[in-house]
Amino acid sequence: MKQYDYKTVSRTMLGDLHTPVSTYLKVRDIFPQSALMESSDYHGSENNRSFIALCPLASVSIDHGTAIFRLPDDSREEHPITDAYRVENALNDFRARFRVEGEYSNYCGLYGYTSFNAVRYFENIPVKDSREATNDAPDMLYILYKYLIVFNDFKNEML
């Protein structure tokens, strides 16, 4: 298993002139597969952050009973999800391939989603497995991004 090593480089900027949405609207057409994720926890403002993720390096998706790894060297691996090799094994195997060091490296993780249909991998609940040509999104998709813009609304700063 090949190990991918990365080191973070960060810069802090004053964030009171920019909003996550306005910044995302400026960069979304330049960087395909970009993502905007905003905090919805309004109880503790010290942890209220928004993220814009740009330029995917690698991804892991779970779909139709198969884990698919897309790695930084453009290789692709497929692993069937079974009782012996579960979703959590696939996610841990994928995550273990990456080592990120440096300031704010704790932000460099996997960003993505888990759809409702992913319940079939964790509980004994039947879910209709449909394949649609127009919208066949994976049940789970998590991406490691090259660039992150982190908005800390509590401190009015951008990383």
Where are these regions (language model features)?
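Signature of the chorismate-utilizing enzyme
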Residues: 1-159
